[in-house]
From Swiss-Prot:
Subunit record text: Homodimer.
Entry cofactors: Zn(2+); Co(2+); glutathione
Name assigned to this protein: Acetylornithine deacetylase
Gene this chain is encoded by: argE
Source superkingdom: Bacteria
Active site: 82, 144
Record's keyword annotation contains Plastid: no
One BP annotation, GO: L-arginine biosynthetic process
């Protein structure tokens, strides 16, 4: 029942007060079970059917799917329940206490992106869900900030095929229809240690890595020349060498060297294609030094994503907002949801606030976000 639902600001406050940090470091990682329970109870109060899905390979993490209405198609509104960790020394406010000041709502997850669920719940007060002609789905996922395991698993296991989806990441209510992917690898070279006074008795891993880096930089140049997507501010795939470490003393032949790198592919480039290009680039080193070079994923890869620019979802949202869709360089869960249906990324708050101390969402987004959610539900679920 709608009268059981707390006021908008109290929903927001409860979401922010419920920690749901995702981190690769086990000591910082938290379950999102309490937050999922909160959301599940509220959607049940509104008459939704609710399914809670354990996500394999995680530390007690869950997805939630709330659904109402019958038939095929419909609309999926999606978002993630987790946040990044916070740096206690850089926050001037309690990250788990929602505070309002000077037209801003402060708290961890206000913009990225637990607050989106408060907007959905509040908007549903003004939607007669008994009159829906197509189903409405609300998806809350786990671990977006680390492995994206929740969205991956949901996309792999669900039979749902909505007409379209909107992911409420903070885009300042500017619709996003495409973004790059992300691949992060560790290049490891195993040499053979020895005393530096006789280099011939060892294999210097740093020297081998120097050779490997030369080939990787050639790949970077080839990617820039071969692939283009002019709508992006950086209109080609980027390759970055982000971290390197090797050796332990100046008088020892380096036995091991490790390089961390990432590639941000354009939409349409497959992960298999990129892995092949990287392996081909490193093949001369591997052939010269068999068994000494390995390539391992640092994180599960994320492909690029694109919603067809002429899809009805794009046309409807552009008309409602009076704004053209954009493309961005950061990543979201859209590549996985896009395997189910055409998907846009669109939500309140600024991406510039994501992962920042004293994260906030400007209150000027409250009214237009609420109105937009009502409008897209009416368009895709009532017609």
């Amino acid at each position: 029942m709608k009268n059981k639902l707390p006021p908008f600001i109290e929903i927001y406050r409860a979401l922010i007060a419920t920690p749901s940090i995702s981190a690769t470091e086990e000591a910082l990682d938290q379950s999102n079970a309490d937050l999922i329970t909160l959301l599940a109870d509220w959607f049940k109060d509104l008459g939704f059917n609710v399914e809670v899905q354990p996500v394999p390979g995680t530390r007690n993490k869950f997805n939630m799917l709330a659904s109402i209405g019958q038939g095929a198609g419909g609309l999926l509104l999606a978002g993630h329940t987790d946040t990044v960790p916070f740096d206690d020394g850089r926050w001037t406010r309690d990250p788990f206490t929602l505070t309002e000041h000077d037209g801003k709502l402060y708290g961890l997850g206000t913009a990225d992106m637990k607050g989106f669920f408060a907007f959905i719940l509040d908007a549903l007060r003004d939607v007669d869900v008994t009159k829906l002609k197509k189903p409405l789905y609300i998806l809350a996922t786990a671990d977006e900030e680390t492995s994206m395991a929740g969205a991956r698993y949901f996309a792999e296991t669900t039979a749902l095929r909505p007409d379209c989806a909107i992911i409420g990441e903070p885009t300042s209510l500017q619709p996003v229809r495409a973004h790059k992917g992300h691949i992060s690898n560790a290049i490891r070279i195993q040499g053979q240690s020895g005393h530096s006074s006789d280099p011939a008795r060892g294999v210097n891993a740093i020297e081998l890595m120097h050779d490997a880096i030369g080939h990787i930089l050639q790949l970077r140049d080839n990617l820039k020349e071969r692939y283009h997507y002019e709508a992006f501010t950086v209109p080609y795939p980027t390759l970055n060498l982000g971290h390197i470490h090797g050796g332990d003393a100046s008088n020892r032949i380096c036995a091991c060297c490790e390089l961390h790198m990432d590639i941000r592919p354009l939409p349409g480039m497959t992960l298999n294609e990129l892995n092949g290009l990287l392996n081909d680039a490193l093949a001369p080193v591997s052939e010269r030094w068999p068994g000494r070079l390995t390539v391992d994923e640092l994180h599960p890869p994320i492909p690029g994503y694109e919603c067809p620019p002429n899809h009805q979802l794009v046309e409807v949202v552009e008309k409602l907002l009076g704004a053209k869709t954009e493309v961005v360089n950061y990543c979201t869960e859209a590549p996985f949801i896009q395997t189910l249906c055409p998907t846009l990324v669109l939500g309140p708050g600024s991406i510039n606030q994501a992962h920042q101390p004293d994260e906030y969402l400007e209150t000027r987004f409250i009214k237009p976000t609420r109105e937009l959610i009502i409008q897209v539900i009416h368009h895709f679920c009532w017609h």
